[in-house]
């Protein structure tokens, strides 16, 4: 134990030494002049968005030009090495932006053609707007040198949501002197209040890919927190009004499933189809209505396959467009709104002693309809209201008497979530989130909470957290608290301490997500980082953390520490490592409701290392190797991923992940006498994914993707747990033979 702690400590100390000389002070604030650019009104013909920049307005001698960009990377604070000039014009309908990106080596301009909203190894420019000028929210618009568009929303000053898709125009073109980008951003893409003359927050940035150089017009060092808080000012916008808009997005999906032959499906094949529509309508300049009928589940089917042997529910990311857009408003420390609950797989089962086998069971609950209203009102108040109705779902099954029957496995349900958030102080907010689930055969489930995120005036320190409650039956009310105090900025030193409390009655999983209740945890982390080139390093991050947790009975169920380091090298490769220690003695969930289980061996250790090559090359790869002890056994895992781009419009990706577990003691089942049955598990698991993409045009692509998972389980030494880390081996192994095998 002491030897391993010493090794880990020496490794972390060596990482700090390799990070370069320690600064004498951790200065976080600099005096800065806020830059300003004036937009020029188009009084004649508006620009044609083609990247040529030959429209009369772009040669107007009265244009106010934004120039003199500053490096954010690699040489922070230094002047740009390639000149960039930006101009802004506008008319009654839209904002127009032009970039002149001069390059001394135009033959090295990178132009990878990919699908919209996908990052690539390309030169690019970005326009970031804060129309409310609240220093908290906004939109960002990217154009690559290949003309590929990306966009997203910005919230809470620094957080981004790439799921937002605006209807705007952009084009890029290569010129002998470099390349140009041209924007048309209609006002209906933006949310702002009416005013005689507007002042918006704005920033422009550029990335020169072959130099890995990122420059900002309105510069702020990486040591200072904030994104929108450091924007410059866009002035001169007079006589413009927010525009209403209507978008209708119909869809049709067809698919086929091929599997094993069953009694219900004699040939193992099934053809499926689905249609629906999404609608977006601007109710006002700052409120938008989104509605959907039978939302697209096509993207949900791309969830990575998982074999979950733990006591915790698998969390899946949201992929449906209706639920993705604007989801940032519902993000709070406690996940009271987990949108994958809406339309989830049916959770009920057939309660019929005569049931023989299933003929048909829906994979998901049908959403009859859903609608939401989102926006930001005057005074800095953001609101979001969502309501969805799901259909009753039934399973068709065959009885032992040869009769076909149906049973309800998911009652009809109504889901509601209401969010309100108020800007306060300097780049801070307080808010509330409330949810309600009404479903036949269940008592209405109500949850709610108040959250906050408060910064000091200089943006260095912040205090954030949330208090929540839940009531899912007539009697028990649960509560929870999350609090975090952090040093959010600083050139070298950052860190935080945090506290989490979830009482035994806290139940938020009807519409939210939590891995457990009956839990109290305290912990913290510390990080030392560098961003100056030193020796072979460009950037380094060195972090250590420790957290301890107990249930309300006082049992020690979570005590873990970690040290990790990340090094970005001057050749743009990245390497790093992590070391973890787990010292808790008990688990109160492993027996699935049958008391405490003592870990066979404690403490346990794990560690790993990774390597990522320069993704700008045609061929790149990343790999990681991890190993450790766990549950009285050991394990190791390895991942290898490869990307190959033979041409700018052609890309192949492949990855393989292999995981091997030896002699790990795991819960298997509970017997009729409520005793937990355990066994030693040997597990081999391999997962694969492959994607091929061809871009025929920047707005037309063809993609083929596949993924798979194969797991082999071998349970041995089956035994009954009697407590105090002792077992009775009086189990007939043949009774559990079906648990072994290969699963895919």
State the predicted function of each range:
Residues 24-422, 431-432, 442:
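Structural preference for beta-rich elements and adjacent junctions enriched in aromatics
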Residues 221-241, 393-458, 487, 573-618, ...:
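Outer-membrane beta-barrel transmembrane domain signature of Gram-negative proteins
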Residues 186-194, 226-241, 283-287, 326-330, ...:
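Outer-membrane beta-barrel proteins
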Residues 366, 458, 465-744:
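Exposed, low-structure sequence patches enriched in small/polar residues
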Residues 1-5:
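N-terminal secretory signal peptides that target proteins for export/translocation
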Residues 242-290, 415-471, 532-535, 540-546, ...:
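Surface-exposed extracellular loop regions of Gram-negative outer-membrane beta-barrel proteins
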Residues 93-95, 137, 179, 196-200, ...:
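Outer-envelope beta-barrel architecture signal
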Residues 8-19:
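Bacterial N-terminal signal peptides
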